[in-house]
């Protein structure tokens, strides 16, 4: 008894918890009950008492205790040895009477438990049925024996009160033919049950009235049946139907349908002989209800039949017509849902149908959450012809999961079915042939029913839900897992679900303690749900819950159709948008049997339209569809081309001039008038981006001014972020561009995808753009910059006829004037100094506007884009990606060095978009072959004629005069050039020619660099490896000129390298993509690690040395640099001394960095090693004398001016960026006085750093060389 006491204490401790009760608590109670199984009677009694005495809100938890105990016992000991279920069933009626005293909201939970019991055969259907009736407010049926004394003569007239309902009365009140069918007490009890409701009493009264009128001698019943009776019949049937629909709970008629498949199966195959074998003493309520169903069918069928026999056909027709408006959906939905239940009596009168429907609805209301009820209710009033035709099909089509039971063929049901059959034959009077017909019909329907049942079983095995007529089933394969331990990992879930099948994804939400597991196959998800919901499976310390989850593909507008129990969204065909079909399958699958065949034809016609677009965008972004539409918004027909853009890139629609997208070349007469600012310039799809044009090929004969209507995605340079592989498919056959038209193409190609469509500078612009950009977003599969920011008239449009001098770099930052700020829209005509921030600067005549993404044509005087620091002679546009300045006529294309003659403003990728671009800088891809191939590997084919010179433009192309400042050689790394760097602009001036004062960069170094650089100006670009190698973040940034704030995160850093051989500013580092910047960018610039940067020794050595130094502490910073999204202000290290020698300089060859490098080394290196070195005084001296001074002197000479100028900037930046800096006060002084190398060795420094510093210095060179060599 100790176990019983323990159980009682657990059970009554429920009162200490506020409902709902946790699963853990239920588990404890269940365990206590199982331990006390020897005293199971006590346990059962305790639970029943608890339910009886507890507060209303604890009634349902009490039921859950019963459920948990019974199911656990069955699970543990097997159904046969389970003692709890039979014991609970002894007193279950009174227990449920107590349970139904719960709050009204909880009744649905009780019904749900009953349905689950029924579904899982926890209790017999005859036990559960009365409990369900109770929920509907129907008192449990009382079976009273029929006694002779209870019979009384029925002499009631319509006006007199109705006699009390007793089986005997019922029998007497029925016409003789009916009485012959109602013989035993079972049937009588069932009829009594039916007639106990008010509707039943009305029905009885109507029957009596009909009987009385039949007895009166009247010429015809037509006269006898006054309209009032018909109206009453109609009202009654309508009332019953409405009642069924209104009640969530079951109405008496609904009980007519048995819930239990077992029970129905009992009737399914059984002949009368089978029924006689069953014990007559037990008259389960469900059996009674089943009988009552047949009686219902009989009664109403007989009424209708009588009316027909009396030639009242037109009356019934009238009845049907009045009821037809009530039909919610066509008959076939009824058939689909109900299966063969309707085939049982296809042509019965409308009144009988009304009764039958609620019963069928019962099935669906329970299993399909009553969603079908509304649809199915009024469907009864369908003409007889429909019934006759459909009766044959119904059995085959019935698919509802629950209809194995509804297909039952009890003798009575067969009788009613056969009657309907005989009535079809001209309603001849009932005859003996009915029995033969019944057999024939039952055998026929049986085979079809069996097929339907087998098909249904197959679907159930696959975990597919019942099919609803004219409804699309979107079956979820996503499972919600609840009560997941917060410490659980994704691997725990994977381990649990792997056994069921392939997992597509797992999305954990630890704060809510849940997860969404998406399986690849519905069947796997179904099995996982079945198994994991039945037992207590734990993840970590918690027992998980599991249920169906709405799959991702179903949008909110369809959530109302979601059925959580079945894990399916039933979407009516009329509400399905064909465009959404593919999306539905995300996280789920579409039941192909429910797909409307018409959709297939619609979809098959659509691809034809889209083929044109897809050919134009060979590298569409995954899951992006390319759609071409004629924009009706604009008065002229404008083809809106949507180019898939890399997912991170905002899409904008290009509005080309009024040509269809498919048109490869604009009509000859088309003039290159720039579109209004809010429209994008158009590009010629037939022409490749400027960077790709083979230089040697003479331009085809095409009017240069022509503006291509649209830029085909394939032509557009793939966005930088793309990998070369994505570009492989692009066909370059069409890439050759007529010289005249090159400009237009060039402008587009240069735009980086990330930035494309964002007018970096202009903020007002977005508003104008919105309609176009949003409505027709151009997504370029390649992320290509092909689209130009709205404001920019595409070069094609702007450049139209332009002086040949305009060059464009695809993917390379064009030259921009640092000082000039460009408006995202169009700057309008500007003097040569105009630079565009958008990220593309083309040399433009002063008149040219520059658009947000592209700088209009600028006079050659424009020296470089923000990204390029080098000063160019005024005439030469500098392409960040191009090496060297070219005569104005020579266009630089990133891929071609000066390949193209005149046309083509440089296109800089719109760097201004600060955030988009960085993360995947195409630059990396481009770098390897940088200058020659703007896109680099991406369009290798495009420049057949051009040698892949690393950074050197063909001599013929480049003018030596032009070269002096050309930092151009630095390759496309510059693509991210920053259009205008406010910081840089002023600084640079000294460097630039007088003509472009704005452009100049403050660095005095520029001039110096020229001297030193010449030798190294076009060093071969390092292998891609070096390029991609992440640079030490600090160094680069430090070296570069101050970084523009603009350069900040989003915009790809421009390589300031133009400035001197040294990389000017590593904006890039600031930007997201640092790795490329450092090494890669250097390579781009043509500074090989192998080549000496300045007078000093190999790049390689320094670079590597620096890298290692950074290696330890740097790791984090490098990472940060790579994905920097922080204060870019500090990152750049544009400090004066940094400025003097780009960060690279620091990293690679600047001794000045030594001080903090030393500190860093101290931190990073083994202290033992450091200490040894520190101890060696000679080593320090040696270092000072031999090693440090020469490099410093050179460095100073080289970058003197810059160093002095930039001191201030660098300090904060360095601190922000580099860990080295933080910990090292000594380095700061060094920065402040970079020129004084001696300071490092000065007594102060020595004191600060102590011997360690000196030792570090010594060690550093060693480390450098070692690492460099290794590298």
Swiss-Prot record:
* Comp. bias intervals (Basic and acidic residues): 270-283, 447-461, 1011-1027, 1034-1064
Q: Which residues form the RRM domain?
A: 477-551
Tell me which Gene3D superfamilies the record gives.
1.25.40.90, 3.30.70.330
Question: Which GO terms of type biological process are on file?
Answer: negative regulation of termination of RNA polymerase II transcription, poly(A)-coupled; positive regulation of DNA-templated transcription, elongation; termination of RNA polymerase II transcription
Q: Could you name the Gene Ontology cellular component terms for this entry?
A: cytoplasm; mRNA cleavage factor complex; nuclear matrix; nucleoplasm; nucleus
**Where Phosphoserine occurs along the chain?**
273, 617, 779
**Stretches for region Disordered:** 270-289, 322-354, 384-468, 899-918, 945-1064, 1198-1271
Name of this protein: SR-related and CTD-associated factor 8
Q: Please name the source species.
A: Homo sapiens
Q: What is the lineage of its organism?
A: Eukaryota, Metazoa, Chordata, Craniata, Vertebrata
